[in-house]
Amino acid sequence: MHSIDASVERNPNQILLLGRNDPVKGHDFAFQIMNELERRGSNMTLHCTGREEVPEGSSNIVAHGWVSKEEKVKLLQESSLLLLPSAYEGQPMVALEALACGTPVLASNALHSLPDVIFRPGEETLESWVDLIEHIRGRKLVFGDSLTQHSVESINERLLSLYQGLIEPES
């Protein structure tokens, strides 16, 4: 898991979408969000990974393609918000990585197993996502112990305990 690097300056106008180029990841919905933000006069920019190209005429979207782990961490630390508009995910590690970097996360209501510090749009409408982005923008969050139960170590410990209980039942 990553930690916050105080030397990296966060850009209050930078939103991030990390994920492969797959319809389930919600790139197209994120592009709609950016179009609406631009229509409202916002100067926010979406940086997205997993895609080489952006829709024609999109001046507020930057495609990074596939990025290294180091580039991913830098993007997480520079961004003011991570979007997770995915239709479904198992345990979305990218959300936990973002939170570990101090980056707020706005995730689809369809995603479960996330800490309670994740922002949710309420209704899954374009307007509710855009309204919440404008509300969250540039907020500094304090997570406290909320992430501990979702850390890799904690999940591994719980799985190990579960498997040991199955293999070695109590007498």
Language model feature labels by segment:
Residues 50-73:
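Nucleotide-activated donor-binding/catalytic signature segment of Leloir-type glycosyltransferases, i.e.
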Residues 87:
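Aromatic "clamp/platform" in nucleotide-sugar-dependent glycosyltransferases that forms part
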Residues 82-83:
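A short hydrophobic beta-strand element within the catalytic core of glycosyltransferases
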Residues 7-25, 31-34:
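Conserved donor-binding/catalytic core segment of Leloir-type glycosyltransferases
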Residues 74-79:
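Short alpha-helical donor nucleotide-sugar binding micro-motif in glycosyltransferases
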Residues 137-170:
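A charged, aromatic-enriched C-terminal amphipathic alpha-helix characteristic of glycosyltransferases
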Residues 95, 104-107:
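Short hydrophobic beta-strand element within catalytic cores of glycosyltransferases
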